Regions:
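Class I S-adenosyl-L-methionine
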Residues: 1-118
Length: 118
């Protein structure tokens, strides 16, 4: 009974996976997102988002971004097998977010050895 409860606890507790390849420090250095037409002013680098997702979520987890912008977090989630819920109130950024997510999903499907139909 103890082992069952311990396993359940381990499954439910907040994940935090710091390791040699994903160190936890209070200073992060990531290249900024280079300017391009339509770039969101607060767009985060994919490397930084993947670092955050690797250290704080499990495979298949759901990630909520209440200020989704152009869905950089969502794109990282698609690439890392996380589910994504994004909220964006600015129509032009919402439209761009939808396009970026659709493109990321299409890319992931073609990258899979056995792409799901649909």
């Amino acid at each position: 009974e103890y082992e069952d409860l311990r396993r359940e606890y381990e499954d439910l507790r907040r994940p935090f996976f710091a390791s040699a390849d994903r160190p936890y420090t209070d200073t992060w250095t990531f290249d900024t997102v280079k300017p391009y037409p339509g770039k969101h002013p607060c767009e985060k680098p994919q490397d930084m988002l993947r670092h955050i997702l690797k250290t704080s979520t499990r495979d298949g987890a759901t990630v909520l971004d209440c200020f989704a912008g152009t869905a950089s977090t969502g794109v990282a989630c698609v690439k890392m097998n996380r589910r994504f819920i994004g909220i964006e109130m600015e129509p032009r950024y919402f439209d761009t977010a939808c396009q970026r997510l659709e493109q990321a999903v299409r890319h992931q499907r073609t990258a899979l050895p056995f792409a799901p139909k649909g």
